Amino acid sequence: MADNDFLSGEAIMVFKKEILDSHSDFTRSLSHQSASPEAYDQENVFSQDFQPFMKQDKETQNSASQPTSEQSLANRDPCTVPDDLREEMMRQRRKEDAFKTALCDAYKRSQACSYGDQCRFAHGVHELRLPMNPRGRNHPKYKTVLCDKFSMTGNCKYGTRCQFIHKIVDGNAAKLASGAHANTSSKSPARNAAAHNHSLFVPQGSTDRSMDLNQSLPIRQSDLVRAFARATRLDVSGYNSTAQLAQYFESQFQRIQQLSSHHH
């Protein structure tokens, strides 16, 4: 019984010694491998390979946690910023609203643009977009409502810049405007010129007082020529007198009437 206990105790001691020796050998082997130049080089190469990814990830986290100054400025309330920053905010918003809302002049001339895809203007009608706050000709209601001043008096001080439709709807007003130059020549030269220009657009003997001319009556002859050139895209530089222009308008009006009668 005692011999068996002694053998068992000796076996346990041997087993413990083997475990300790194995652990010591493993520790020495591990320390030797970690201290070897090859292992150091492998570890260094591994860290260098992953360094760009770690740097990129860090930059991504920083950009996500810290927005750019333009983004933070655009998201701020205009009522809570100083005047200079508010002006910068409005400038950025106007720039963003105007993006691709007009055709590129360089692209229209030569079908090429040095800015390429970075151009703020549209390279073709397919790229055009409506602005966020349309004004002028871009407004959806541009030239959709009659101009009260022009409809009643046949004249408008805004001229071709008027945002409303210039259409004669009152026959009495048209007669008054067409004959005003004979009655008020000594009282108001400006009104006389306006009435005379109006008679150019309303040919004598015409009973159609509702024709849509879609533009006003310039007072000066040069304005009249430019307005007609813009509307028709024709060269009217050869017409040096108002009488020649009146004759030309008369012939154009008759031609339009003939075309409309053929269609009906």
Swiss-Prot record:
Compartmental location: Cytoplasm
InterPro entries: ZFP36-like, Znf_CCCH, Znf_CCCH_sf
Keywords, in A-Z order: Cytoplasm, Developmental protein, Differentiation, Metal-binding, Repeat, RNA-binding, Translation regulation, Zinc, Zinc-finger
A Pfam cross-reference name: zf-CCCH
Residue pairs linked by disulfide bridges in the UniProt entry: none
Zinc fingers (C3H1-type), renumbered ranges: 98-126, 141-169
SMART domains named among the record's database cross-references: ZnF_C3H1
Feature: compositional bias, Polar residues: 61-74
The keyword Protease belongs to this UniProt entry's keyword annotation: no
Biological process terms in GO annotation: cell fate specification; embryo development ending in birth or egg hatching; embryonic pattern specification; negative regulation of transcription by RNA polymerase II; regulation of translation
Effect of gene knockout: RNAi-mediated interference leads to maternal-effect lethality. Expression of glp-1 in all four blastomeres including the posterior EMS and P2 blastomeres, instead of only in the ABa and ABp blastomeres at the four-cell stage. Abolished asymmetry in neg-1 expression in AB descendants.
Binding of Zn(2+) 2, residues: 147, 156, 162, 166
Binding site for Zn(2+) 1: 104, 113, 119, 123
Record region (Disordered): 56-82
Record note on quaternary structure: Monomer.
Cross-referenced PANTHER family: C3H1-TYPE DOMAIN-CONTAINING PROTEIN-RELATED (PTHR12547:SF110), CCCH ZINC FINGER/TIS11-RELATED (PTHR12547)
Name under which the protein is recorded: RNA-binding protein pos-1
Source species of the chain: Caenorhabditis elegans
